[in-house]
């Protein structure tokens, strides 16, 4: 497994090259173009010929994926995931689900610390699965993911905080027999990027700031996207 990053010491306003500002990213589009440049350097796309696809994680990751796909000249789709939150405290993620997989992927250490069993989370999982199915119907008319067996798949998000939803997406795609998995994001804490090396063949991150509290802090413009926004990006 290969982890490719610019630096683990970026702070706001630092540059990767003389005169070039890296953080904060102006917006998701600019971050996507930067990420595409990094992917061009890091991944041997010629090896896969026409068997490469970019999959964005909704919603914000789709805006980044759109730029990556446009710059690299690749097809794009989405892979829908949902965070499994602690009951009554949904912002605390204890796992995630992704389309194409039957069971959630849990943060085993955290669920053990909290004393949670799958039965404790059954209601939350059911609600998130219903929302996942709703989004698949909206984004892809209810059709399943296109076949990825034997393909190189580049999974793109707008940033990784814990990496829980990305982990679920990667496991789903591995089960679907994707031949080569690349996880790509503009920004992530180094700990999250390293924790996902076992799930992907390559992890490509533009910047891994040493101080990290949220993805949004590393963007000047980080508005929430709607389902309509995602559909427009997929059009």
Predicted regions and their residues:
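PRPP-associated nucleotide enzymes
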Residues: 1-235
């Amino acid at each position: 497994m290969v982890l490719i990053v610019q630096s683990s010491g970026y702070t706001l306003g630092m540059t990767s090259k003389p005169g070039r500002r890296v953080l904060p990213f102006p917006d998701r589009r600019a971050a996507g173009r930067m990420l595409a440049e990094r992917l061009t350097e890091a991944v041997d796309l010629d090896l896969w010929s026409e068997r490469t696809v970019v999959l964005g994680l909704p919603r914000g990751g789709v805006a980044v994926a759109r730029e990556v796909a446009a710059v690299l000249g690749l097809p794009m789709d989405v892979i829908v995931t949902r965070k499994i939150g602690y009951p009554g405290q949904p912002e605390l993620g204890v796992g995630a689900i992704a389309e194409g997989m039957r069971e959630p992927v849990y943060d085993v250490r955290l669920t053990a610390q909290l004393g949670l069993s799958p039965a404790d989370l059954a209601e939350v999982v059911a609600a998130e699965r219903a929302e996942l199915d709703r989004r698949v119907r909206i984004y892809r008319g209810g059709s399943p993911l296109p076949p990825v067996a034997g393909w190189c798949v580049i999974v793109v998000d707008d940033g990784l905080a814990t990496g829980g939803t990305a982990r679920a997406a990667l496991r789903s795609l591995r089960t679907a027999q994707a031949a080569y998995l690349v996880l790509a994001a503009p920004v992530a804490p180094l700990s999250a990027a390293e924790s996902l090396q076992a799930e992907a063949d390559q992890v490509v991150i533009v910047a891994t700031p040493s101080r990290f509290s949220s993805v949004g802090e590393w963007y000047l413009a980080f508005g929430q996207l709607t389902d309509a926004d995602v559909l427009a990006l997929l059009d």
